[in-house]
Amino acid sequence: MSLKGKKITVHDMTLRDGMHPKRHQMTLEQMKSVATGLDAAGVPLIEVTHGDGLGGSSVNYGFPAHTDEEYLSTVIPLMKQAKVSALLLPGIGTVDHLKMAHELGVSTIRVATHCTEADVSEQHIAMARKMGMDTVGFLMMAHMYSAEGLVKQAKLMEGYGANCIYITDSAGYMLPDDVKERLSAVRQALKPETELGFHGHHNLAMGIANSLAAVEVGANRIDAAAAGLGAGAGNTPMEVLVAVCARMGIETGVDVFKIQDVAEDLVVPLMDFPIRIDRDALTLGYAGVYGSFLLFAKRAEAKYGIPARELLLELGRRGMVGGQEDMIEDTALTMVRERQKLGHKVAVAA
């Protein structure tokens, strides 16, 4: 596999996907510190919002320490070369949120839907293109759909005006062959000028391998996070990705040592717990469960005595997807009742 001479855009997730393990409680000072470090390291694109995107502040997803407006207006003026992106999930974020982000200086908007529901993105993608934004269609939980199905969804988003399509391994479930099959099919179906991206999670330790597989079949935008800070076992660790790319001759424009220092000196100290592949994060990848479900499952374990691993396996069996966070507690309660019927003791917290 020779990828020498290829150029990719590394897109940072530390300040957006990294909000999940922080329970959306990053301070403005932490945002400023990490963002300026990433900018100085040469990272060209940095995503900044609530973990669930613009408008994510809610009972269902969690209330952040600050509003999206505060985070964006704090970070954007400090950037010397990096551009700032925002995530938007139709049904959570609105056109008004999109306009707010544009007015604050967000250059890239990523409109995210479940991998079978691209049709709900039409209004937001069309509006973003009308405003002249770099507009990305972001197909989540892509392991749950065939390559042929993803092609149809990607073509819809491209037709609405998206100039880049992302195939997103939200559960960290895919293996390199899965990535190649899906992304190569989508790459062949899209217009040559439409860019292709990949967003990975490290639940099966496949973040780097999957990202390289994506580049091999034509992806030129790759998501990663410093020290892997993100949902589950985290995103593809950026400092490792950049070092591997340097070894392989893939051009990222990111300084190998500066991004290591950002990860080690700025991101690791702000972690509330180590981002690693523990048994529950591994279960996310093994069972194909949405990454941000992890902390919800751990909280349900503490409350109802149902092991998080067993709960995650059940959520995977039921095919739960992002947006169904409220069903995690419901599923835990159902499992408690079923066990009590069978005479099993379940320790429910008062």
Swiss-Prot record:
Mn(2+) binds at residues 17, 199, 201. PROSITE patterns: PYR_CT. Substrate binds at residues 16-17, 170, 199, 290. The keyword Manganese applies. GO terms for molecular function: 2-isopropylmalate synthase activity; 4-hydroxy-2-oxovalerate aldolase activity; manganese ion binding. It comes from the Bacteria. The record marks 16 as: Transition state stabilizer. It catalyses: (S)-4-hydroxy-2-oxopentanoate = acetaldehyde + pyruvate. Its EC number is 4.1.3.39. The active site is at 20 (proton acceptor). GO terms for biological process: catabolic process; L-leucine biosynthetic process. It is an enzyme of class 4 (lyase). Keywords: Aromatic hydrocarbons catabolism, Lyase, Manganese, Metal-binding. Residues 8-260 form the Pyruvate carboxyltransferase domain. Belongs to the 4-hydroxy-2-oxovalerate aldolase family. This is 4-hydroxy-2-oxovalerate aldolase 2. It comes from Comamonas testosteroni (Pseudomonas testosteroni). The gene is tesG.
